[in-house]
C-alpha cells in the first residue's frame, strides 16, 4: 500500500545517474544545466543575490566559467541551416548531470557518402566518477566512503546478475549493465542505490510507482520503462530495468545538436503523449519530463554526409521511445512540492507557485517537442524572472489573473512583469528569443500543425492548456494514424 505522503529527497531530483543518463553518447564533459526541483530552490538562497545586470554582459562567451553559464540557443534559424558549430547549441547541465562522459557510438572521423549504408549500434560506456558530498552514515565493508557499493566487472548480484559494465555513477548511486543468468543471458540495467537512509527511502517511493505502472500495464503498451524486479544487496536497494538505448537528448548531442526529422518527431510525440496520458489517467504527474528522460528503445542509426551543413548526419532507424525516471512522480492525493521540473521545462504555474497538477507535464512536453524540432531549448536560463521574460517574448504577456494570484510579487510591478527590455539582460532575451511561430523552419502544413500543437501545450493558464487526451486527437497526428 502506497504512502499518502511521499518521502522527498533533494538529491532525488538532482541525481546524475537517472535512467535517462545511463545511455550516454559523448565523451565530452557536459556543461551545467538548470537545477531540478529542491536543489535549485536551495541554491537560489545563496546565489540569487549575486545576480546583477553586469552578469548579462553581451561580451560573455559560452566558455565562461560563471555559475550562471547558460545553454545557448541559435540566434535565428540561419545559424542552424548554415551548420553552426555544435558548441553554440550546447546544453548547460546542472549538478545532476556533471562529470558525465562516455564513449562515442562508433562514428567515423571522416565523412563519406558510403556511410549512408552503414548501420551504427549505440554502446554504453563508463561514466567518470565525480565528487559528491560526504554524508555521515554507517558503512559496510563493501561501500566506499560516499556510500557507493564497491563492485567491478565479473561480480554477481543476488546470485543472478553478473556485472559487465558500469553505465553511470553519481550522487544517488550507480548503474551497472548486467547479464541475467536466470533469464537466458539477457542484458539488463541495475540501479544500485547508495546505502544511505534518505536515498533508500526515495528509491522505495519510485519502486511503488513502478510496481503500480507495471501491474497496470504489464506489456508496456503505454511505453513506461519496465522494472523487472528489485532486491537488497548488503544494505543497497537494487532496481532491475530493461536495458534501453540512448536518451533523446544524448542522440541530439551526439548528432551535433541537429534536430530530428519531422516524421520522427510525430511518432515520438505521439508515444510520449500516450505514455504520459497513461500516467495522468492513473492519477500521477511525472513532474520531470525532459529529453533526458525519454529513451529510445534502440538508438541504432544510419549516417550520411549532408552537403548543406558540410558534415555527417545521423538518422534514427527506429524512433520508438519509452518514458523513464519516476523518482519525482506524484499521485494526486500526495503532498505536492512547491518546486518541480527541470528549469527549461518548468511550467509558469510552478514558477509562480500557483500550485500544479497534470498540466505541468503538458507544458514540459511542449518544450520537449520544440527542442526536438530545433535541436536546442528556447528557454536557456537559470533565473525565474528571466524565464518569465522569455515566455512573454515567445508567447505574449502573462495573464493578469495569474499575476494577481501569485505570491511571487518580486517579479512584478503594477501587475506587469518587472523587466527592463533595455538592460543587458533585456537585450539578451530580445536577441535570443522571438515569437513562437518565427521558429518555424517551413510554412508547410505539417510544420504549421506541429506548432499549433506546441502552442496549445504552451498555454499559460493550466486550466486552458490542452490535455493529453485532446492532444492525441490533434491533426498533427493524422498522418501517423493513416499509416497504422
Swiss-Prot record:
What keywords are assigned to this protein? ATP-binding, Kinase, Nucleotide-binding, Nucleus, Phosphoprotein, Serine/threonine-protein kinase, Transferase, Tyrosine-protein kinase
PTM comment text: Autophosphorylates on all three types of residues.
| Disulphide bridges, residue numbers | none
* Gene Ontology molecular-function annotations: ATP binding; non-membrane spanning protein tyrosine kinase activity; protein serine kinase activity; protein serine/threonine kinase activity; protein serine/threonine/tyrosine kinase activity; protein tyrosine kinase activity
Q: Where is the composition biased (Basic and acidic residues)?
A: 86-97
Catalytic residues as annotated in Swiss-Prot or TrEMBL: 288
What broad class of enzyme is this?
transferase
One GO cellular component term noted in the UniProt record for this chain: nucleus
> Which stretches of sequence are listed as region Disordered?
1-42, 79-146
Q: Entry's CDD domains?
A: PKc_CLK1_4
Indicate how activity is controlled. Regulates splicing of its own pre-mRNA according to its kinase activity; increased expression of the catalytically active form influences splicing to generate the catalytically inactive splicing variant lacking the kinase domain. Leucettine L41 inhibits its kinase activity and affects the regulation of alternative splicing mediated by phosphorylation of SR proteins.
- Location(s), subcellular: Nucleus
Describe its partners and assembly state. Interacts with PPIG and UBL5.
* Described purpose of this protein according to its UniProt entry: Dual specificity kinase acting on both serine/threonine and tyrosine-containing substrates. Phosphorylates serine- and arginine-rich (SR) proteins of the spliceosomal complex and may be a constituent of a network of regulatory mechanisms that enable SR proteins to control RNA splicing. Phosphorylates: SRSF1, SRSF3 and PTPN1. Regulates the alternative splicing of tissue factor (F3) pre-mRNA in endothelial cells.
State what protein this is by name.
Dual specificity protein kinase CLK1
Amino acid at each position: 500500500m502506497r504512502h499518502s505522503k511521499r518521502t522527498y529527497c533533494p538529491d532525488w531530483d538532482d541525481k546524475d545517474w537517472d535512467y535517462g543518463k545511463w545511455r550516454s553518447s559523448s565523451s565530452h564533459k557536459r556543461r551545467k544545466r538548470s537545477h531540478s526541483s529542491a536543489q535549485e530552490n536551495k541554491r537560489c538562497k545563496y546565489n540569487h543575490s549575486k545576480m546583477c545586470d553586469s552578469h548579462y554582459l553581451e561580451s560573455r562567451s559560452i566558455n565562461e566559467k560563471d555559475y550562471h553559464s547558460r545553454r545557448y540557443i541559435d540566434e535565428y534559424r540561419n545559424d542552424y541551416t548554415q551548420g553552426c558549430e555544435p558548441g553554440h547549441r550546447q546544453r548547460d547541465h546542472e549538478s545532476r548531470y556533471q562529470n558525465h562522459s562516455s564513449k562515442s557510438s562508433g562514428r567515423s572521423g571522416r565523412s563519406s557518402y558510403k556511410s549512408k549504408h552503414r548501420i551504427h549500434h549505440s554502446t554504453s560506456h563508463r561514466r567518470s566518477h565525480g565528487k559528491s558530498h560526504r554524508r555521515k552514515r554507517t558503512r559496510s565493508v563493501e561501500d566506499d566512503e560516499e556510500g557507493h557499493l564497491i563492485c567491478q566487472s565479473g561480480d554477481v548480484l543476488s546470485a543472478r546478475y553478473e556485472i559487465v559494465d558500469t553505465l553511470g555513477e553519481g550522487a544517488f548511486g550507480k548503474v551497472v549493465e548486467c547479464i541475467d543468468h536466470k533469464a537466458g543471458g539477457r542484458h539488463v540495467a541495475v540501479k544500485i542505490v547508495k546505502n544511505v537512509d534518505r536515498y533508500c527511502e526515495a528509491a522505495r517511493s519510485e519502486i511503488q510507482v513502478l510496481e503500480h505502472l507495471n501491474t497496470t500495464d504489464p506489456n508496456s503498451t503505454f511505453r513506461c520503462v519496465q522494472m523487472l524486479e528489485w532486491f537488497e544487496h548488503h544494505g543497497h536497494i537494487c532496481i532491475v530495468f530493461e536495458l534501453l538505448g540512448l536518451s533523446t537528448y544524448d542522440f541530439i548531442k551526439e548528432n551535433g545538436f541537429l534536430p530530428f526529422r519531422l516524421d520522427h518527431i510525430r511518432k515520438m510525440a505521439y508515444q510520449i503523449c500516450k505514455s504520459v496520458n497513461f500516467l495522468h489517467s492513473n492519477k500521477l504527474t511525472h513532474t520531470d519530463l525532459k529529453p533526458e528522460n525519454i529513451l529510445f528503445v534502440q538508438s541504432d542509426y544510419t549516417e550520411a554526409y549532408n552537403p548543406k551543413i558540410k558534415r555527417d548526419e545521423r538518422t534514427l532507424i527506429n524512433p520508438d521511445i519509452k518514458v523513464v525516471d519516476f523518482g519525482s512522480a506524484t499521485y494526486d492525493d500526495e503532498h505536492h512540492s512547491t518546486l518541480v521540473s527541470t528549469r527549461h521545462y518548468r511550467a509558469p504555474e510552478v514558477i509562480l507557485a500557483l500550485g500544479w497538477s497534470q498540466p505541468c507535464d503538458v507544458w514540459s512536453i511542449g518544450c520537449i517537442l520544440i527542442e526536438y524540432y530545433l535541436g536546442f531549448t528556447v528557454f536557456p536560463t537559470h533565473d525565474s524572472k528571466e524565464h518569465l521574460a522569455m515566455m512573454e517574448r515567445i508567447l505574449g504577456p502573462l495573464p493578469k489573473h495569474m499575476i494577481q494570484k501569485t505570491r511571487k510579487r518580486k517579479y512584478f510591478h503594477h501587475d506587469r512583469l518587472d523587466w527592463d527590455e533595455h538592460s543587458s539582460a533585456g537585450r539578451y532575451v530580445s536577441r535570443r528569443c522571438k515569437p513562437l511561430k518565427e521558429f518555424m523552419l517551413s510554412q508547410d502544413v505539417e510544420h504549421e500543425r506541429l506548432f499549433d500543437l506546441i502552442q496549445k501545450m504552451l498555454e499559460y493558464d493550466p486550466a486552458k492548456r490542452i490535455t493529453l487526451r485532446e492532444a492525441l486527437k490533434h491533426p498533427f497526428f493524422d498522418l501517423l494514424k493513416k499509416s497504422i
